[in-house]
A protein has these predicted regions:
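N-terminal beta-strand motif that seeds the catalytic metal site of vicinal oxygen chelate
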Residues: 1-19, 74-83, 133
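Short loop/beta submotifs within extracellular cysteine-rich repeat domains
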Residues: 18, 26-29, 52-53, 61-64, ...
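Conserved active-site tyrosine of GNAT-family acetyltransferases
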Residues: 18-23, 46, 93
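N-terminal strand-loop-strand beta-hairpin
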Residues: 27-48, 52, 116-118
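A short beta-turn/loop motif at secondary-structure boundaries
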Residues: 36-38, 71, 106-109
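Vicinal oxygen chelate
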Residues: 44-45, 81, 90-133
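Conserved secondary-structure micro-motifs at functional edges
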Residues: 47, 55-65, 73
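Short, solvent-exposed interaction modules
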Residues: 69-95
């Protein structure tokens, strides 16, 4: 089912400062920076080998990411695993007793669908399944 780690999502308070850190200190450049109306966040992706680092800054104080930052502060928010079919994976995992946040996948970008698993079922880690069409 899981093919590989796609990315690690990190919640940040200031995306510009976080980008500066990754560029100047770690020496890597973002491959994509965009604002997501769906997640109410500004996002930057940094390729690092076969895995990407996703930096996420909320743009709305009522968003899920803003609430996460308020409660836990900056840091790792989720791990995303690539799968062939998010919806069939969600069905299979629910049959195995995994609690789901999403019963069906959601389209987050033109060619991507995602679904989240409840951290209570995944050792305290918010887990995202991602499918690229």
């Amino acid at each position: 089912m899981l093919e590989k780690i796609d990315h690690i999502g990190i919640a940040v308070k200031n995306l510009d400062e976080a980008i500066k850190l990754y560029k100047e200190v770690f020496g890597i450049e973002p491959s994509l920076i965009y604002e997501s109306a769906y997640t109410k966040a500004k996002i930057a992706f940094f390729p690092l080998g076969e895995v990407k680092i996703e930096l996420i800054q909320p743009t709305n104080p009522e968003s899920v990411m803003a609430k996460f930052l308020e409660k836990k502060g900056e840091g790792i928010h989720h791990i995303s695993y690539k799968v062939k079919d998010v919806d069939s994976s969600l069905v299979e995992l629910e049959k195995k007793g995994i609690q789901l946040i999403d019963k069906k996948s959601r389209k987050v970008r033109e060619n991507e669908r995602v679904g989240f698993l409840n951290p209570k079922s995944t050792l305290g880690v918010l887990t995202e399944l991602i499918q690229e069409d």
